[in-house]
Amino acid sequence: MTTEAKCPFNHSVVGAGTTNRDWWPKQLRVDLLNQHSARSNPLAASFNYAEAFKRLDLQTLKQELRALMTDSQDWWPADFGHYGPLFVRMAWHSAGTYRTGDGRGGGGRGQQRFAPLNSWPDNVSLDKARRLLWPIKQKYGQAISWADLMILTGNVALESMGFKTFGFAGGREDTWEPDQDLYWGRETKWLGGDDRYAHGSPGVDQAHGVLVKDDDSEVQHTRDLENPLAAVQMGLIYVNPEGPDGNPDPLLAAKDIRDTFGRMAMNDEETVALIAGGHTFGKTHGAADAAHVAAEPEASDLESQGLGWHNSFGSGKGGDTITSGLEVTWTTTPAQWSNDFFDHLFGFEWELSKSPAGAHQWVAKNAQAIIPDAHDASKKRLPTMLTTDLALRIDPAYEAISRRFHANPDQFADAFARAWFKLTHRDMGPRARYLGADVPAEELLWQDPIPALNHALIDAQDAAALKQTVLSSGLSVAQLVATAWASASSFRGSDKRGGANGARIRLAPQKDWASNEPAQLAQVLATLERIQADFNARQSGGKQISLADLIVLGGNAAVEQAAHAAGHAVTVPFAPGRMDASQAQTDVESFAVLEPVADGFRNYAKARYAVSAEALLIDKAQLLTLTAPEMTVLVGGLRVLGANTGQSHNGVFTTRPGVLSNDFFANLLDMRTEWKATSETKETYEGRDRATGEHKWTGTRVDLVFGSNSILRAVAEVYASADAQEKFVQDFVAAWTKVMQLDRFDLA
């Protein structure tokens, strides 16, 4: 008899075995709406991170972080006796996953702690950086989140190396499990790129970049990276430092750089500043072949305790470290701010070489060994650069900026400070979310500024009178609801942009978006502006109402009237205090990325996409931070209120539009109706009476999914039930109010 006990569960465990997605890979991901619930959060429901951060002694914490920078540990010794460059990389790679396409990624949730980011090839050794920070995090506990601490540490690292940063804002709350909604690409191998480009791009092997035979310069010049991705290969933050797919061509690399940094909201000047500024510090690591490097953290053994990439070469650390496979130190002052990067970039001619790991890099021609060794003060090395560094000299636009920065170090320092602040704060949303004594006073255009409240607010009596005025103005329930929804639903919970505050729906580019029906929108806004002007002219004591508030109040009035028509007296909660932004405060190009490609709540799609309409609905709902029941009740309510774009009848499953009823659900689930697609594309459907064949309804995939998908049908059945009318109205009002207030960080 063996000493190993027989497993009572036949060697299976909870969660093991074939899953639903194994059987049905295209199953709708309704579960994406259930992320980051209280069930995964170890903190009390009453915990308020903002209040905890406000009590933090930030200056003392920064002093302790500064001391850590030069407190080299034997288990992971600091390059050049200074951890600053490592922590700059940690902060950069935390924030640098942000992309403008959907606002997801970034450092705002502390996701670098979790898979896949904690095990990305581009994040080798950052597990050690976080472990070096653990004693400080342990000391301060929940007074500072991991998300804030990683960014703050990057700032302190720069300051400890003689650089003056632009500022720091806290306010990033940790999450406690990996994000599931982030689309990183479809590749199944690290550093692959075969799916993100239309022409295919085999990528590179796990060791380092290698030139792939079927990629030529012409293809690489014209390839188009899939949206919303902002990295050229699976597991990279931005670009391959050896060049596209390992092709050491600086001009081709410039194209990838411009594309990926642009998708992170950086222009050419910010891009040059970030690359040159970041590469003023530290080094890359490629002491030997990557075959010496073991599994990443998520694949490591229990005894590794969450650390990965064990290195069998030499000591496995210090001068024997292997990360990217490249072995480059850019400056003679790798732990001190200087202009050395540009001095070397333009002061030497460069020839292609290879690192000890076999990766493409560049070495200065006819140069002396002037670069310090990271761990042996008696050694000097030749100046080296990456292919992506040389892009700043070879690309004409980048070169012009680089030469200007070289000649004007103060401009370079200011540009890097501002670009670093933008990099590390881009996903935080408006300044109203910024916390701490180091928040810079200057207001920046990319922060989507909104004027500070400068007038007395309306009271409940004013709101009631204004609602009556709006309802008597000739505007319909559908028009008021659609306008309020269009304004508020531009919000993205990913990067906290958009929303009703600012009334940017009246400004370019939002006023011209097809989803907002520009002609109807102009009519509604003109009427509301007249009501606003008339009300404000009659007030005393500085009381005013903004158009942003009036748009929401008008939508609330329409919802109340529709509920009353259904026999339910409700008052939709309303909190005044929104302000109106100006066109000068609105970056048209920056806001363009917020335009919806689809909005299932309005049965709108800009075009037909490879992604299903119902999947795009889930995506939109997730960006609006909605749960599955909230999404369901909103779709059903908006349909019967007539909020469809273009006044489409698709999904309007009611004979009494404008009445806030549960008719959408009752009629969708009516077994007397038989549904058939109207074309081979199966985008729209027709519902006919099973017995008579009489036409009853038309609907889209977004409508029918609430009867087709088993999870959504379960929710829809609740609202379709005979006893659900009052619950439906109350739940709709609650979900509507949530969307209207998503950007009201001042109410928190």
Curated annotation (Swiss-Prot):
Cross-linked residues, Tryptophyl-tyrosyl-methioninium (Trp-Tyr) (with M-264): W92-Y238
Required cofactor(s): heme b
InterPro entries: Catalase_peroxidase, Haem_peroxidase, Haem_peroxidase_sf, Peroxidases_AS, Peroxidases_heam-ligand_BS
Protein name stated in the entry: Catalase-peroxidase
Keyword Transferase: no
NCBIfam families given in the database record: cat_per_HPI, PRK15061.1
Record's function text: Bifunctional enzyme with both catalase and broad-spectrum peroxidase activity.
Keywords of this entry: Heme, Hydrogen peroxide, Iron, Metal-binding, Oxidoreductase, Peroxidase
E.C. numbers: 1.11.1.21
